[in-house]
Amino acid sequence: MAHPVQLGLQDATSPVMEELITFHDYALMTISLISFLVLYALFSTLTTKLTNTNITDAQEMETTWTILPAVILILIALPSLRILYLTDEINNPSFTIKSIGHQWYWTYEYTDYGGLIFNSYMLPPLFLNPGDLRLLEVDNRVVLPIEAPVRMMITSQDVLHSWTIPTLGLKTDAVPGRLNQTTFTATRPGVYYGQCSEICGANHSFMPIVAELIPLKIFEMGPVFTL
């Protein structure tokens, strides 16, 4: 989960998030190197006399600064496309859970367990216990298994929402009249937090998402809910 004054990304809890963090570091390193070279060239131009205003043609240089950026963009695009494919790939999920966005709460439906449905509202500050997180705790957590592919089917009953849990690398829009889906495989148990990531009205900031990830063997005994 996130920490105060945190500058980096949250720790990964799924293979896709691990890929995203690796790609982020790779792209950031590439961009930093390019920025350093450009700033160095500008600084050298301003502080030295290594310039020639009489040059009217430099085809080799123009060819180089056309091809080189194209190669760099391709090297960045290829791993990006690979991750994009991984995020959309859905193969034989073990469990399916439906999430419905409302103004301003979430409804969860366990389709594999007799259509069990419950709502998840943010806990107001008056009901928080010591150690709870303000604006992030809910009355009913969505309980999910680890080490098993889970498919989330996401839609909305009113306006646009977005179901997001950063540590799992999940962000899927909830669109009225449309059923979007995403999949993930969590790698470790814990309680992980997210929020609606699409501006959806006056109380947009007050519809958090809390996922409690438990071992698969415990989940298969019957989902454990904090109802």
Curated annotation (Swiss-Prot):
The chain crosses the membrane at residues 15-45, 60-87. It is an enzyme of class 7 (translocase). It catalyses: 4 Fe(II)-[cytochrome c] + O2 + 8 H(+)(in) = 4 Fe(III)-[cytochrome c] + 2 H2O + 4 H(+)(out). Residues 1-14, 88-227 are mitochondrial intermembrane. It is a multi-pass membrane protein. Cu cation A2 binds at C196, E198, C200, H204. Residues 46-59 are mitochondrial matrix. InterPro entries: CcO_II, CcO_II-like_C, CcO_II_C, Copper_CuA, Cupredoxin, Cyt_c_oxidase_su2, Cyt_c_oxidase_su2_TM_dom, Cyt_c_oxidase_su2_TM_sf. It comes from the Eukaryota. Keywords: Copper, Electron transport, Magnesium, Membrane, Metal-binding, Mitochondrion, Mitochondrion inner membrane, Respiratory chain, Translocase, Transmembrane, Transmembrane helix, Transport. SUPFAM superfamilies: Cupredoxins, Cytochrome c oxidase subunit II-like, transmembrane region. Its cofactor is Cu cation. Binds a dinuclear copper A center per subunit. GO terms for cellular component: mitochondrial inner membrane; mitochondrion; respiratory chain complex IV. Cu cation A1 binds at H161, C196, C200, M207. GO terms for molecular function: copper ion binding; cytochrome-c oxidase activity. It is found in: Mitochondrion inner membrane. Component of the cytochrome c oxidase (complex IV, CIV), a multisubunit enzyme composed of 14 subunits. The complex is composed of a catalytic core of 3 subunits MT-CO1, MT-CO2 and MT-CO3, encoded in the mitochondrial DNA, and 11 supernumerary subunits COX4I, COX5A, COX5B, COX6A, COX6B, COX6C, COX7A, COX7B, COX7C, COX8 and NDUFA4, which are encoded in the nuclear genome. Belongs to the cytochrome c oxidase subunit 2 family. This is Cytochrome c oxidase subunit 2.
